[in-house]
Protein backbone atom coordinates (compact mmCIF):
# COMPACT_ATOMS: atom_id res chain seq x y z
CA UNK A 1 0.00 0.00 0.00
CA UNK A 2 1.31 3.44 -0.90
CA UNK A 3 1.99 5.92 1.87
CA UNK A 4 -0.39 8.87 2.26
CA UNK A 5 0.88 12.20 0.95
CA UNK A 6 -0.38 15.56 2.20
CA UNK A 7 -0.68 17.96 -0.72
CA UNK A 8 -1.23 21.70 -0.39
CA UNK A 9 -2.65 23.42 -3.47
CA UNK A 10 -2.22 27.18 -3.80
CA UNK A 11 -4.17 29.47 -6.13
CA UNK A 12 -2.20 32.75 -6.11
CA UNK A 13 -3.89 36.14 -6.08
CA UNK A 14 -2.88 39.52 -4.71
CA UNK A 15 -6.28 40.17 -3.13
CA UNK A 16 -7.04 36.56 -2.19
CA UNK A 17 -4.75 33.56 -2.36
CA UNK A 18 -6.67 30.32 -2.09
CA UNK A 19 -5.27 27.22 -0.41
CA UNK A 20 -6.52 23.67 -0.14
CA UNK A 21 -5.15 20.59 1.60
CA UNK A 22 -5.84 17.01 0.58
CA UNK A 23 -4.32 13.64 1.38
CA UNK A 24 -3.63 11.29 -1.53
CA UNK A 25 -3.06 7.57 -1.06
CA UNK A 26 -3.06 5.71 -4.35
CA UNK A 27 -6.28 6.70 -6.10
CA UNK A 28 -7.98 7.69 -2.84
CA UNK A 29 -8.31 11.39 -2.09
CA UNK A 30 -9.31 12.78 1.29
CA UNK A 31 -10.28 16.37 2.00
CA UNK A 32 -8.28 18.11 4.69
CA UNK A 33 -9.02 21.83 4.84
CA UNK A 34 -9.15 24.95 2.69
CA UNK A 35 -9.43 28.71 2.88
CA UNK A 36 -7.95 31.97 1.67
CA UNK A 37 -5.14 34.32 2.64
CA UNK A 38 -6.02 37.97 2.00
CA UNK A 39 -4.15 41.24 1.71
CA UNK A 40 -5.41 44.76 2.43
CA UNK A 41 -5.98 46.59 -0.85
CA UNK A 42 -5.39 49.93 0.88
CA UNK A 43 -1.79 49.08 1.71
CA UNK A 44 1.28 49.63 -0.48
CA UNK A 45 2.30 46.66 -2.62
CA UNK A 46 5.27 45.74 -0.43
CA UNK A 47 3.09 45.47 2.67
CA UNK A 48 0.43 43.48 0.81
CA UNK A 49 3.10 41.01 -0.26
CA UNK A 50 4.30 40.77 3.32
CA UNK A 51 0.75 39.92 4.39
CA UNK A 52 0.61 37.14 1.80
CA UNK A 53 4.07 35.88 2.74
CA UNK A 54 3.20 35.71 6.43
CA UNK A 55 -0.28 34.30 5.80
CA UNK A 56 0.93 31.51 3.54
CA UNK A 57 3.69 30.81 6.04
CA UNK A 58 1.14 30.32 8.81
CA UNK A 59 -0.83 27.90 6.63
CA UNK A 60 2.25 25.86 5.71
CA UNK A 61 3.24 25.66 9.38
CA UNK A 62 -0.27 24.71 10.48
CA UNK A 63 -1.15 22.02 7.91
CA UNK A 64 2.39 20.63 7.41
CA UNK A 65 2.11 19.41 3.80
CA UNK A 66 4.54 16.97 2.20
CA UNK A 67 4.31 18.63 -1.22
CA UNK A 68 2.97 21.89 -2.60
CA UNK A 69 1.36 22.62 -5.99
CA UNK A 70 0.90 26.13 -7.39
CA UNK A 71 -0.99 27.34 -10.44
CA UNK A 72 1.12 28.92 -13.15
CA UNK A 73 0.57 32.54 -14.15
CA UNK A 74 -2.13 33.07 -16.75
CA UNK A 75 -0.95 35.88 -19.02
CA UNK A 76 -3.78 38.08 -20.27
CA UNK A 77 -4.08 41.41 -22.08
CA UNK A 78 -4.00 43.37 -18.82
CA UNK A 79 -0.25 43.61 -18.22
CA UNK A 80 -0.69 45.30 -14.84
CA UNK A 81 -2.99 42.55 -13.57
CA UNK A 82 -0.57 39.89 -14.81
CA UNK A 83 2.30 41.62 -13.02
CA UNK A 84 0.36 41.77 -9.74
CA UNK A 85 -0.50 38.09 -10.06
CA UNK A 86 3.17 37.37 -10.63
CA UNK A 87 4.05 39.10 -7.36
CA UNK A 88 1.51 36.98 -5.47
CA UNK A 89 2.69 33.80 -7.17
CA UNK A 90 6.25 34.56 -6.10
CA UNK A 91 5.09 34.48 -2.47
CA UNK A 92 3.27 31.19 -3.09
CA UNK A 93 6.46 29.66 -4.49
CA UNK A 94 8.91 31.19 -2.04
CA UNK A 95 7.26 30.32 1.27
CA UNK A 96 7.15 26.53 0.83
CA UNK A 97 10.55 26.54 -0.87
CA UNK A 98 12.06 28.23 2.20
CA UNK A 99 10.42 25.51 4.30
CA UNK A 100 12.31 22.89 2.27
CA UNK A 101 9.19 21.53 0.57
CA UNK A 102 9.07 20.36 -3.06
CA UNK A 103 7.00 22.81 -5.12
CA UNK A 104 5.33 21.95 -8.42
CA UNK A 105 3.59 24.18 -10.97
CA UNK A 106 0.65 23.37 -13.23
CA UNK A 107 -0.86 25.27 -16.12
CA UNK A 108 -4.51 26.38 -15.75
CA UNK A 109 -5.67 24.32 -18.74
CA UNK A 110 -4.04 21.17 -17.34
CA UNK A 111 -5.80 21.69 -14.02
CA UNK A 112 -9.15 22.04 -15.79
CA UNK A 113 -8.40 19.03 -17.99
CA UNK A 114 -7.46 16.84 -15.04
CA UNK A 115 -10.35 17.76 -12.77
CA UNK A 116 -13.22 18.42 -15.17
CA UNK A 117 -12.13 16.62 -18.35
CA UNK A 118 -11.80 19.77 -20.46
CA UNK A 119 -9.07 22.39 -20.63
CA UNK A 120 -11.78 25.00 -21.19
CA UNK A 121 -14.06 24.05 -18.28
CA UNK A 122 -15.87 26.87 -16.48
CA UNK A 123 -15.41 27.58 -12.77
CA UNK A 124 -18.80 26.13 -11.93
CA UNK A 125 -17.76 22.84 -13.55
CA UNK A 126 -14.50 22.81 -11.62
CA UNK A 127 -16.33 23.40 -8.35
CA UNK A 128 -18.84 20.65 -9.10
CA UNK A 129 -16.07 18.14 -9.79
CA UNK A 130 -14.13 19.17 -6.68
CA UNK A 131 -17.26 18.51 -4.62
CA UNK A 132 -17.70 15.17 -6.39
CA UNK A 133 -14.11 14.04 -5.86
CA UNK A 134 -13.96 15.45 -2.32
CA UNK A 135 -17.50 14.99 -0.91
CA UNK A 136 -16.55 16.45 2.48
CA UNK A 137 -15.01 19.59 1.01
CA UNK A 138 -16.39 22.86 2.34
CA UNK A 139 -15.53 26.07 0.51
CA UNK A 140 -17.30 29.40 0.24
CA UNK A 141 -15.14 31.11 -2.36
CA UNK A 142 -13.88 30.04 -5.77
CA UNK A 143 -10.25 30.64 -4.76
CA UNK A 144 -10.38 27.81 -2.22
CA UNK A 145 -12.09 25.48 -4.69
CA UNK A 146 -9.44 26.29 -7.30
CA UNK A 147 -6.71 25.51 -4.77
CA UNK A 148 -8.26 22.10 -4.09
CA UNK A 149 -8.40 21.50 -7.85
CA UNK A 150 -4.68 22.29 -8.05
CA UNK A 151 -3.98 19.79 -5.27
CA UNK A 152 -6.08 17.15 -7.06
CA UNK A 153 -4.12 17.80 -10.25
CA UNK A 154 -0.83 17.22 -8.48
CA UNK A 155 -2.16 14.01 -6.96
CA UNK A 156 -2.91 12.82 -10.51
CA UNK A 157 0.46 13.79 -11.98
CA UNK A 158 2.95 13.54 -9.12
CA UNK A 159 4.33 10.18 -10.25
CA UNK A 160 5.64 11.89 -13.38
CA UNK A 161 7.96 13.92 -11.14
CA UNK A 162 9.26 11.05 -9.01
CA UNK A 163 12.53 10.63 -10.90
CA UNK A 164 13.12 14.40 -11.06
CA UNK A 165 13.35 14.96 -7.31
CA UNK A 166 16.64 16.56 -6.32
CA UNK A 167 18.26 17.75 -3.12
CA UNK A 168 20.24 20.85 -2.31
CA UNK A 169 23.46 20.63 -0.25
CA UNK A 170 22.66 20.18 3.43
CA UNK A 171 19.69 17.92 2.78
CA UNK A 172 17.13 20.57 1.81
CA UNK A 173 14.82 19.52 -0.97
CA UNK A 174 14.92 21.74 -4.00
CA UNK A 175 11.80 23.48 -5.28
CA UNK A 176 10.94 21.99 -8.65
CA UNK A 177 8.88 23.29 -11.53
CA UNK A 178 6.53 20.57 -12.76
CA UNK A 179 5.67 21.07 -16.40
CA UNK A 180 3.65 17.87 -16.54
CA UNK A 181 1.81 16.92 -19.69
CA UNK A 182 -1.75 15.69 -19.38
CA UNK A 183 -2.07 11.91 -19.26
CA UNK A 184 -4.08 9.91 -21.74
CA UNK A 185 -7.75 10.12 -20.89
CA UNK A 186 -10.51 7.62 -21.43
CA UNK A 187 -11.57 7.41 -25.06
CA UNK A 188 -14.11 10.10 -25.82
CA UNK A 189 -14.17 11.33 -22.22
CA UNK A 190 -11.03 13.43 -21.89
CA UNK A 191 -10.27 12.36 -18.32
CA UNK A 192 -6.77 11.34 -17.27
CA UNK A 193 -6.45 7.71 -16.17
CA UNK A 194 -5.91 8.74 -12.54
CA UNK A 195 -8.91 11.09 -12.54
CA UNK A 196 -11.08 8.44 -14.16
CA UNK A 197 -9.99 5.88 -11.56
CA UNK A 198 -11.00 8.23 -8.75
CA UNK A 199 -14.37 8.95 -10.32
CA UNK A 200 -15.04 5.24 -10.82
CA UNK A 201 -14.02 4.54 -7.22
CA UNK A 202 -16.36 7.27 -5.97
CA UNK A 203 -19.22 5.91 -8.06
CA UNK A 204 -18.58 2.41 -6.76
CA UNK A 205 -18.83 3.65 -3.17
CA UNK A 206 -22.07 5.50 -3.90
CA UNK A 207 -23.48 2.44 -5.60
From Swiss-Prot:
SUPFAM superfamilies, per database record: Ribonuclease H-like
Main location: cytoplasm
Gene Ontology MF term list: crossover junction DNA endonuclease activity; DNA binding; magnesium ion binding
Binding residues annotated for Mg(2+) 2, in chain numbering: 71
E.C. designation(s): 3.1.21.10
Record PROSITE patterns: RUVC (PS01321)
Cofactor field: Mg(2+)
Binding sites annotated in the UniProt record for Mg(2+) 1: 11, 143
Cofactor binding notes: Binds 2 Mg(2+) ion per subunit.
Keywords on record: Cytoplasm, DNA damage, DNA recombination, DNA repair, DNA-binding, Endonuclease, Hydrolase, Magnesium, Metal-binding, Nuclease
Cellular component GO terms held in the UniProt record: cytoplasm; Holliday junction resolvase complex
Active-site residues, as the UniProt record annotates them: 11, 71, 143
One GO-annotated biological process of the protein: DNA repair
Signal peptide segment: none
Compartment(s) of residence: Cytoplasm
Pfam families: RuvC
Recorded catalytic activity of this chain's protein: Endonucleolytic cleavage at a junction such as a reciprocal single-stranded crossover between two homologous DNA duplexes (Holliday junction)
Family note: Belongs to the RuvC family.
Subunit description: Homodimer which binds Holliday junction (HJ) DNA. The HJ becomes 2-fold symmetrical on binding to RuvC with unstacked arms; it has a different conformation from HJ DNA in complex with RuvA. In the full resolvosome a probable DNA-RuvA(4)-RuvB(12)-RuvC(2) complex forms which resolves the HJ.
General function of this protein: The RuvA-RuvB-RuvC complex processes Holliday junction (HJ) DNA during genetic recombination and DNA repair. Endonuclease that resolves HJ intermediates. Cleaves cruciform DNA by making single-stranded nicks across the HJ at symmetrical positions within the homologous arms, yielding a 5'-phosphate and a 3'-hydroxyl group; requires a central core of homology in the junction. The consensus cleavage sequence is 5'-(A/T)TT(C/G)-3'. Cleavage occurs on the 3'-side of the TT dinucleotide at the point of strand exchange.
Protein name, as recorded: Crossover junction endodeoxyribonuclease RuvC
Organism whose genome encodes this protein: Methylobacterium radiotolerans (strain ATCC 27329 / DSM 1819 / JCM 2831 / NBRC 15690 / NCIMB 10815 / 0-1)
Lineage, top ranks: Bacteria, Pseudomonadati, Pseudomonadota, Alphaproteobacteria, Hyphomicrobiales
Gene designation per UniProt: ruvC
Amino acid sequence: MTSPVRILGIDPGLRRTGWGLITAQGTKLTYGDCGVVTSDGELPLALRLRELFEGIGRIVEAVRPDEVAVEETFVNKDAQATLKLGHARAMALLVPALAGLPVFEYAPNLIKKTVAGSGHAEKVQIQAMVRFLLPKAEFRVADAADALAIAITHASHRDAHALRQAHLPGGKRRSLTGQAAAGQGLAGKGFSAAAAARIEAALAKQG
